[in-house]
Amino acid sequence: LENALNYAVQEHHVAARSVGIVMEVNTGAVLAMATTPAYDPNQPRVIADKAARAAVDALSGKERATALQLAQQTQWRNKAVSDLYEPGSVFKLITCAAALDAGAITRRSTFYCGDSISVAGTRFHCANHKRHGSQTVTQALENSCNQSFIQIGARLGKEAFCDYFAAFGLREPT
């Protein structure tokens, strides 16, 4: 898992830390968990992340001490279980799989991402406020495009969405 995670981080130019979890699909038991960059528990005070280490080394005095402490605490934290995440971007994979399976979309379907999209009087933007323009399902996933996934969810419909929610076992305790 660590090797696959390191490869994915390098291949996709991930700037922040990343996390991977492998679970037993029938029981939900955690089989493996990894975060990158990892640190050497035999040298826990050595900052493993090269960029973080360079940023700390560029400082001096109290600023350096504060930055060093923050960098150490960041690398020690198990991101998989300690950080909070909004479920939206993670759930985009489930929304996509459900819509493809239901025939609500195909791999060739396209979606438009402009300034914003309105749902029930609330305007939604992409998290980085980029306008992706016309994009395929694959591009919408790559961009984690909020507007495209609002459109995909609308095509799927709320009843089918709820049915797939149950089909994926998301109403069952883990």
Sequence positions of predicted segments:
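Conserved, well-ordered alpha-helix/loop/beta-strand core segments that scaffold catalytic motifs
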Residues: 2-18
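Beta-lactam-recognizing serine transpeptidase/beta-lactamase-like catalytic domain environment
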Residues: 18-90, 94-174
